[in-house]
Structures are given as C-alpha cells and as structure tokens.
C-alpha cells in the first residue's frame, strides 16, 4: 500500500506543469549552454558539427519553453518585453549556428556578445519573477 501511495505522489508531482520561475531557470540554462558552446567553438575546442547541433537544439528548446511560458505569462513582468527578449535570444542562437556553417568567427563573436547581453536581461526578469512568487 505504501508503495502505491509513493508511486501516486511521484506521478502527480511529475505531471505538475513547471512554474514560471522554473521555466525561466530552464531558459537561463539553455542560454548558458549556447554561450559555453559558442565560447568553445571560438577557441576551436569543439567540432563544428557538435557546436552547430547543440546550438540548434538550444534554439528549439528555447522556442518550446518560451512558447509554454508565454501561454500563461507571469503577472510580474511585461509579457511583450519578455517575448521580445526571448525572441531576440533565439534569433541570436540560430544565427550563431548559421555562422558556424559559414565559419565566420568575427560575426559569430558579435552574436555571442548579443546573446550575453540578452542573458543579463533574462536573469533580471527571472529574478523579478522569482521574488514575486
């Protein structure tokens, strides 16, 4: 009986949708992944294919999390600003993947800088959401 109760509690917990703060944490994590892969690619320590695929996965995952978050945006932030920052971040990540294909390190570095600036804004929004939960 105890075992069934534990399984039920775990199953119910697993079905609970993530909170906006948890979604923002995931977004920050995927942006950090893109940043780290970008830095590694610029240092020539990761293969082009791996770097490009990781950036593409980051963009796709960011799109999914962002879409879910914006279906029911947190009340503590302006949803238009949040959407704008998240869209800009995804575009930067997608552009970085294309620039790897083109082997264009100078433009890649500029996109990486843009991504870093957006990461700071996402962190501020995330902190705002977390403090109001």
Please state what every model-predicted region is:
Residues 86-128:
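Extracytosolic low-complexity repeat regions of secreted or lipid-anchored proteins
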Residues 14-18:
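Bacterial signal peptide processing site
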Residues 4-13:
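Sec-dependent N-terminal signal peptides
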Residues 22-95, 110-114:
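Alpha-helical segments in soluble extracytoplasmic regions
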Residues 1-5, 24-27:
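Alpha-helical transmembrane segments
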Residues 130-133:
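Juxtamembrane amphipathic/coiled-coil helical coupling segments that flank
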